[in-house]
């Protein structure tokens, strides 16, 4: 008997990598032109080193909406924020870039995985998005079962 697998049943780091691969391979997600020169937030000094960072961030946001929904841009800025280095003065928390998160959410809306919440309280995952994420998780679980 095959047990149903959801995104919550698999390792979060692995599922994000698999979702990112799926988004890149599907060709539906278009990386913005400015992605090679942008920082991920005010707390970062350099642009991301991973060339597929946009797919990974979009996949991470999709997983986050699966687990905790509805979620808005400001809440996601807190999740992806970090410590800002200020030299000899103690560090402070700084939010992540709202533009990057907003564009990633708009990308997920374009492929019909995410929609705006009817009450205006952020965004929620659609049935199609939930179904696709569960399918990716079950394929991941099956591949792990065959390789182990």
From Swiss-Prot:
Keyword annotations of the record: Ribonucleoprotein, Ribosomal protein
Gene3D superfamilies attached to this UniProt entry: Winged helix-like DNA-binding domain superfamily/Winged helix DNA-binding domain (1.10.10.10)
Pfam families: Ribosomal_S19e
Entry GO terms, CC: cytosolic small ribosomal subunit
Domain of life of the organism encoding this protein: Eukaryota
A molecular function (GO) term: structural constituent of ribosome
GO biological process per UniProt: ribosomal small subunit assembly; translation
Entry keyword Ribonucleoprotein: yes
Residues making up the signal peptide according to the UniProt record: none
Chain's role: Elimination of the ALEP-1 gene from all somatic cells in its fully activate state may represent an alternative way to gene regulation.
Protein family membership: Belongs to the eukaryotic ribosomal protein eS19 family.
Protein name as annotated: Small ribosomal subunit protein eS19G
Organism encoding this protein: Ascaris suum (Pig roundworm)
Upper lineage: Eukaryota, Metazoa, Ecdysozoa, Nematoda, Chromadorea
């Amino acid at each position: 008997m095959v047990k149903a697998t959801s995104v919550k049943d698999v390792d979060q780091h692995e599922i994000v990598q698999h979702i990112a691969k799926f988004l890149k391979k599907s060709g539906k997600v278009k990386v913005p032109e400015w992605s090679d020169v942008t920082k991920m937030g005010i707390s970062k000094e350099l642009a991301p080193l991973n060339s597929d960072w946009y797919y990974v961030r979009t996949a991470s946001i999709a997983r986050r909406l699966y687990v905790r929904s509805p979620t808005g841009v400001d809440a996601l800025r807190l999740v992806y924020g970090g410590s800002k280095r200020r030299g000899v003065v103690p560090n402070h928390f700084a939010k992540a870039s709202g533009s990057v998160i907003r564009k990633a959410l708009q990308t997920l809306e374009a492929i019909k995985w995410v929609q705006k919440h009817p009450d205006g309280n952020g965004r929620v995952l659609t049935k199609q998005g939930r179904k696709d994420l569960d399918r990716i998780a079950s394929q991941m679980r099956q591949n792990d079962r065959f390789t182990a």
